[in-house]
Amino acid sequence: MPRRGPVPKRDVLPDPIYGSKLVTKLINKTMVDGKKSLAEKICYRAFDIIREKTGRDPLEVFEEAMKNVMPVLEVRPRRVGGANYQVPVEVRPERRQSLAIRWIVNYARERNGRSMEEKLAAEIMDAANGVGGAVKKKEDTHKMAEANKAFAHYRW
């Protein structure tokens, strides 16, 4: 913890093509080894694939996917009298967004074959339709929170 007060939050700039901060965050999460231009290419090509396959605005599809993947609850471990309890807590809005993007990119990477653009496009389209690995991860997170509802009074 810093002694000189809170650390200021750095704001990301909206991306040049879609003018969305959400897309910039997706690009940053897709980036590996600081290769941002490659990450941008991957994301924009994925969005082109989404436009081709759905005939809808890719930003709209991506926002729909985000809505379907963002978790409302998660569990956090809390040590009480020598036992670790999984305590369900509400997820802050910024964390919801970052978790959703992280899950979409990670599950896109885990998909078989093809190029990263196609895998990312497929994962975003699946998430927008309420299926796919990222949506399953959200449902599992909610199930864990539901199963541990009894420990909700240990919240801090």
From Swiss-Prot:
PROSITE patterns: RIBOSOMAL_S7
Any GO CC annotation of this UniProt entry: small ribosomal subunit
UniProt keyword annotations, A-Z: Ribonucleoprotein, Ribosomal protein, RNA-binding, rRNA-binding, tRNA-binding
Domain of life: Bacteria
Pfam name, any one: Ribosomal_S7
Keyword Lyase: no
Gene3D superfamilies hit by this protein: Ribosomal protein S7 domain
Any one GO BP annotation for this protein: translation
UniProt keyword Kinase present: no
Functional summary from the UniProt entry: One of the primary rRNA binding proteins, it binds directly to 16S rRNA where it nucleates assembly of the head domain of the 30S subunit. Is located at the subunit interface close to the decoding center, probably blocks exit of the E-site tRNA.
Similarity section: Belongs to the universal ribosomal protein uS7 family.
Quaternary structure and partners: Part of the 30S ribosomal subunit. Contacts proteins S9 and S11.
PANTHER family: RIBOSOMAL PROTEIN S7
Protein name as catalogued: Small ribosomal subunit protein uS7
Organism in which the protein naturally occurs: Carboxydothermus hydrogenoformans (strain ATCC BAA-161 / DSM 6008 / Z-2901)
Lineage, uppermost ranks: Bacteria, Bacillati, Bacillota, Clostridia, Thermoanaerobacterales
Name of the gene this protein is made from: rpsG
